[in-house]
């Protein structure tokens, strides 16, 4: 087994503080599952290159706890790892890209501050990855909908999280949902341990997994212990702006936590400040623009079919920024109507930019 025998202990000190993070939001104390006497194999420095000749085994030599923190306080893992120098070389071929890593489990549509907290906890244990499923909507027959974050923009967001994760940006790893849909909770954890060869998982307290979502967080901890990998369960990041009287999302799972559903609702309402608080950044809309999409030298007008992710609701949005490639940002106003997105600048002539290509990807950040 890749990770040596482990003993998983549930951290009994569940801190229920709700400290503000400065944006009207708060963190509940993380419930950390602690490990004693187990070995970690970190993943390769660059999962895509596979050009390393040796994997180092690291040993957890002290437990770690969790506390409620404000945004200025960062919990530190004291004396957690010690490197062993007598490990044999391991073959690179055949290893999964997440081998030896710590995977955060969830649906990472919005890449909001709750998702960021999962990766922060993963980075404190080892190399952080986001493990998610693709093709879920098609398999389950859900109506297709635009993503909150454009696929081409996700790497930028993850890179921005590096400063929270020990200067190491988390990487994404996707699994076809159809390939795991019928797995029992035990089979799913065994896949993580034996096939993907991860050394640990991080999940939220409401995480469900396995066929028909039959497994919960406590079962995840138990199964991970049996498979010799660690599990870290953290409390949900709560949306402190919306009180209990206003939590009307229509979602029975909604207990007031930050979620992709809340982000979608805030976008639909056009509340861009609230969206920024939930995301931990300004919402960025990606447009696919052609030269004929510029009716004037200071305006871009594209149909909704040319946007790559979810726009805010119908309305006029001022104090936005237009970004074209590596060009500096340009102040602009955005008008969203039922069929088009209009972007108008006051000072810069868009026709002066390089439009030699058939189309360009243009970004708009909402203030």
Swiss-Prot record:
Q: Name one GO biological process term.
A: FAD biosynthetic process
In chain numbering, the transit peptide falls at 1-57
Q: Which UniProt keywords apply?
A: ATP-binding, Chloroplast, FAD, Flavoprotein, FMN, Nucleotide-binding, Nucleotidyltransferase, Plastid, Transferase, Transit peptide
**What highest taxon heads this organism's lineage?**
Eukaryota
- A Pfam family: FAD_syn
Principal EC category:
transferase
Q: Which reaction does it catalyse?
A: FMN + ATP + H(+) = FAD + diphosphate
Query: Which SUPFAM superfamilies does UniProt cross-reference here?
Result: Nucleotidylyl transferase
Query: Per the record's keyword annotation, is Transit peptide included, yes or no?
Result: yes
Its name, as the record gives it, is FAD synthetase 2, chloroplastic
